[in-house]
């Protein structure tokens, strides 16, 4: 970084400030993680200089012989990691991966089914503000009002009624394991393609800690960060080589130009890391830590959507906090996601407000707080520390108007950050 400090001290200073923020805060956004120094090095390499439109061995530019080897390595490792027959490592993001699938399989006006965003779905699964909700006729399914788990009776009824061409499973705020076989049965009954978006759980899937959708779904998409702990990017997988050819064309030239080969190198490194036994241990720890945090919060009387978690994330139903604040006579007894998000920021915990199923609050206020364990697990924290974090969060939420309590919480967070340093090699 010395050359950057000399050439552009303003950008260097801002990067250092962001590094310090990451070091001094407990990162609990479920979709974030800390990638390895090796991935950082690959992304910051001379590969960023090279244009490489096309696929390995089929480029539109010369000088791609080493680029081809790197991209093919990423492809081969991705296929091995997930047991896929075909992989495309070029999508710039998970959203780009999903768009390419739509381009390959659908025509404008076709019907698609995806989970309602407020129940844990994703913008790219048919939200009206996203291109997926503008180009296609969208039918949303959700969770059961009692169990807060996927309502498969509703999914089947809607599928039979609307006959979608594509059914999407996989979510951004769903704390339970996904029954891909049940979705396959419904998709077959109505003749629909089945897409699994495993952006949040890819690392757990790759290590056998969540069922693998590749053998059951027509297409699988994912991001390469989150639980996979790679660079920010996308990935498309399929068990069908012929379908893979259509997907490749939908990526290039269908929806992208030149691939980001420095990021693809980072993906190759991350996939290689994920193939090591230590990564399977990491994934198991992610789940154990999430369950330790969930138990700690529940013991303090905080309700979790669906009653807990099977994966790396959980949703706090903050109405349970509001009920306690009202009983104790708090000046402001309403704890919303927006308010909780800001409180977490004050004590240096990074989280995000989130809607919960059947949420009475608007999305920008929300009644939920989403927490995840991947980043802090990477940092080395274990179940004991996650239980302590649960206590810190509960103290903060139940005493939001006590400056002394908030300061004590912030100091406890600072102590944890000092015990588990982040990127010490970066100076």
Swiss-Prot record:
Its main location: cytoplasm. Its cofactor is pyridoxal 5'-phosphate. InterPro entries: PyrdxlP-dep_Trfase (IPR015424), PyrdxlP-dep_Trfase_major (IPR015421), PyrdxlP-dep_Trfase_small (IPR015422), Ser_HO-MeTrfase (IPR001085), Ser_HO-MeTrfase-like (IPR049943), Ser_HO-MeTrfase_PLP_BS (IPR019798), SHMT-like_dom (IPR039429). Its EC number is 2.1.2.1. The modification N6-(pyridoxal phosphate)lysine is found at residue 226. One of its GO terms (biological process) is tetrahydrofolate interconversion. It is an enzyme of class 2 (transferase). (6S)-5,6,7,8-tetrahydrofolate binds at residues 117, 121-123, 242. Pathway: One-carbon metabolism; tetrahydrofolate interconversion; Amino-acid biosynthesis; glycine biosynthesis; glycine from L-serine: step 1/1. GO terms for molecular function: glycine hydroxymethyltransferase activity; pyridoxal phosphate binding. Coiled coil: none annotated. It holds the Pfam family SHMT. It is found in: Cytoplasm. One of its GO terms (cellular component) is cytosol. CDD domains: SHMT (cd00378). The record marks 225 as: Plays an important role in substrate specificity. Keywords: Amino-acid biosynthesis, Cytoplasm, One-carbon metabolism, Pyridoxal phosphate, Transferase. It catalyses: (6R)-5,10-methylene-5,6,7,8-tetrahydrofolate + glycine + H2O = (6S)-5,6,7,8-tetrahydrofolate + L-serine. HAMAP family: SHMT (MF_00051). NCBIfam families: PRK00011.1 (NF000586). Catalyzes the reversible interconversion of serine and glycine with tetrahydrofolate (THF) serving as the one-carbon carrier. This reaction serves as the major source of one-carbon groups required for the biosynthesis of purines, thymidylate, methionine, and other important biomolecules. Also exhibits THF-independent aldolase activity toward beta-hydroxyamino acids, producing glycine and aldehydes, via a retro-aldol mechanism. Belongs to the SHMT family. This is Serine hydroxymethyltransferase. It comes from Synechococcus sp. (strain JA-2-3B'a(2-13)) (Cyanobacteria bacterium Yellowstone B-Prime). The lineage of its organism: Bacteria, Bacillati, Cyanobacteriota, Cyanophyceae, Synechococcales. The gene is glyA.
